[in-house]
Amino acid sequence: RDVLGSRGLGDVYKRQDYSQVKIFGADESPAQFKDAFRRINELFITEAKKYNVGKQLKKEVTEISLDAVNQVNENIDLTELMTAKREYTLSKEQIKAAINALPIQKTPGVGMVFIAQFLDKSNNRGTYEVVFFNTETKEIIEEWITDGKARGFGLRNYWAGSIYSALKKL
């Protein structure tokens, strides 16, 4: 997808926001997931070549910042993380609220965030809302749902595998 078109790129931030996610069918505790979420985000720095959003979009990423999502992810309500429902999607209002909640500098540019929606262990799938937004106004430019097959050894790598699969669909 050429989401940005001829638009000036500015700064594109790539990150995982887990503040809205629901998890189905997993044996791990909410606290284990919260720790895994932080470690998954670190992969965007430590394994930047593998998790290269810019390459997929054919655009230069001028900054990778995890500060904003680390702050919102730190405030995840562990009692709300797990669900017994087999489906879950975010409303437009929840998506807009998630973008508005990101504590970012209001500088000109385009931000990108993967908002995790649903991690379904029974189907080995992670579902994500891909959101591009104006970093100055937080106006949403474009958004769509994608998913990826979860795979890998250990909690972090398993769900990071779903992000990697989802990135390939950009």
Regions found by a protein language model. Name each.
Residues 136-170:
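Short secondary-structure boundary motifs at beta->alpha junctions and helix caps
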Residues 2-10:
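Single conserved hydrophobic/aromatic residue that forms the stacking wall/gate
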Residues 94-139, 143:
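Mature extracytoplasmic/lumenal regions of exported proteins
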Residues 11-17:
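Short, hydrophobic/glycine-enriched beta-strand segments
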Residues 88, 92, 126, 152-160:
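Solvent-exposed, acidic/flexible segments
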Residues 18-20, 117-122, 148-151:
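Solvent-exposed loop/turn segments at secondary-structure junctions
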Residues 12, 27-31, 127-129:
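Short secondary-structure boundary/capping segments
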Residues 18-107, 111:
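N-terminal segment of the mature soluble domain
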